[in-house]
Amino acid sequence: MDEADLICAIGARFDDRITGKLDEFAPNAKFIHIDIDPAEISKNVPAHIPIVGDVKSILPALTKEYRALDADTTRLDPWLEKIEGWKEKYPLSYEDSSDNEIKPQYMIEALYEATGGEAIVTSDVGQHQMWVAQYYHFPEPRRWINSGGLGTMGFGLPAAIGAKVGCPDQQVVCVTGDGSIQMNVQELATCVTEDIDVKIFIMNNGSLGMVRQWQELFWDENYSHVHFSESPDFVKLAEAYGMKAFRMTDKTTLVDEMKAALETPGPVLCDVRVTPEENVYPMIAPGMPAREMVG
């Protein structure tokens, strides 16, 4: 975005998680801002072209106008080449563990392999949410349901329930953290009572991982209320609700164990123990522009 010359924002709030340092956000860009709420237009970023209305009608109208243009798409070639260059220079990568420990990135890769990339995936908020975005390569739209920048811990499990009820023939997977799952853990009872076939995979790192990462990087490791010294045994907790549950600790068997869980009839909870101190990158430090992201 830092090098964009035009940004078309659809329902965006331009909050600080997107912009970083506001007065240095996309300095060369013109902004088209579409929102149903006029109060959001130009609230944080001045809109050069404000459009107030429902995207359900606005986007088809804009698409019709765009397709009527005889645009020279070859003009995009240098820009696309530049993007490919960035991908080669800054690939998503991580240092895999030398033993059988499960890295959180690998957990998502394993889940992608186990599901064949065909599941509807819901997620909560935190590191696991970012890793789902990076390592579960969604082949088509409307496959990932999350609360985005709203930061709604506890969203993932109810969203998975709704997705499964709405799309009963689709495989539905909830990826959550050991913090987020406890925000709405009572909905395990809903899954069992109504026999809603969702598969829940807890990325268990023993902490509120995203907050811990911020305190590590920006608060001199002054940790406060982020490590879970006492957490429930999630397998026993799920079983107490009458749900089948598995614990996964070995990366060499992870894909097969995930496949077995996915093939188990009815709702299932999987407690996946991942390396506890892994950080998710890249990220924008507080008060910094996007071009100076960490990692």
Where do the model's predicted regions map?
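Active-site diphosphate/adenylate-binding microenvironment
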Residues: K82-P158, A163
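Structural signal for hydrophobic packing residues in well-ordered secondary-structure cores
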Residues: D5, G11-F14, L59-D70, I83, ...
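Glycine-rich, N-terminal phosphate-binding loop of Rossmann-like dinucleotide-binding domains
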Residues: I10-G11, V125, T176, R273
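Thiamine diphosphate
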Residues: M1, F25, I41-V52, K56-L62, ...
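Short coil/turn segments at secondary-structure boundaries
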Residues: T74-E81, D124-V125, D271
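Conserved acidic/glycine
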Residues: D72, E84-K89, S97-N100, P286-G295
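Glycine-rich, acidic loop regions that bind phosphate or pyrophosphate groups
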Residues: M1-W79, M258
